[in-house]
Structures are given as structure tokens and as C-alpha cells.
From Swiss-Prot:
Stated name of the protein: Acylphosphatase
One annotated GO molecular function: acylphosphatase activity
Organism: Roseiflexus sp. (strain RS-1)
Keywords: Hydrolase
Lineage, uppermost ranks: Bacteria, Bacillati, Chloroflexota, Chloroflexia, Chloroflexales
Superkingdom per UniProt: Bacteria
Cross-referenced InterPro entries: Acylphosphatase, Acylphosphatase-like_dom, Acylphosphatase-like_dom_sf, Acylphosphatase_CS
Active site: R21, N39
Domain Acylphosphatase-like: 6-93
Length: 93
């Protein structure tokens, strides 16, 4: 049985308007993580990553740098119980 994990992440800094969501979606699909990503009105990006623990950890680590034009200042990670409800990875508009 796979070791599953779920991370609820809030990323602060210059993370909107820098292709963060599309890059997160592409990397999530590459590493095989389900979930979603969206911009928040306060300028942060919020995301949920669920899947095999090692893949979720790769996504969380990626959030500390993000795409090349992002300037990440802080990452708030909340580890939650996996729900198994996520299917694929999407951008919430």
C-alpha cells in the first residue's frame, strides 16, 4: 500500500502574474499529484496536493522556488489527512 499524503499550502511573495498556477499544474502532472491551485485576493497562492508522500513532498519543495519569475517569501504548509477525493490537477479560476 502506498504511503499517501495531503498538503494544503499557502505561498506568499510575488506569486501572482508569474505563471505560478500553470507551472504548479504542469509539475503536479509530471510527478503524479492530484489537487488544485488558485490565486487568493490577498496576493497569495493556495494549493492542495494529494498523492504518494514522496511526490507530494516534491510539490511542496517546488513551492519554495516556483517558476523562474516568482519571488517566494513564505510557504505555509498544513499536512492533512488524505481524502482520496482529488482527481487530476486543476487551476481554480
Amino acid at each position: 500500500m502506498m504511503d499517501m499524503a495531503r498538503a494544503h499550502v499557502f505561498i506568499s511573495g510575488r506569486v501572482q502574474g508569474v505563471n505560478f498556477r500553470a507551472s504548479a499544474r504542469n509539475y503536479a502532472r509530471e510527478v503524479g499529484v492530484s489537487g488544485w491551485v488558485r490565486n487568493l485576493e490577498d496576493g497569495r497562492v493556495e494549493a492542495v496536493f494529494e498523492g504518494e508522500r514522496s511526490a507530494v513532498q516534491k510539490m511542496v519543495s517546488w513551492c519554495y522556488s516556483g517558476p523562474s519569475h516568482a519571488r517566494v517569501e513564505a510557504v505555509d504548509v498544513r499536512w492533512e489527512k488524505p481524502t482520496g477525493e482529488e482527481r487530476g490537477f486543476s487551476i481554480i479560476w
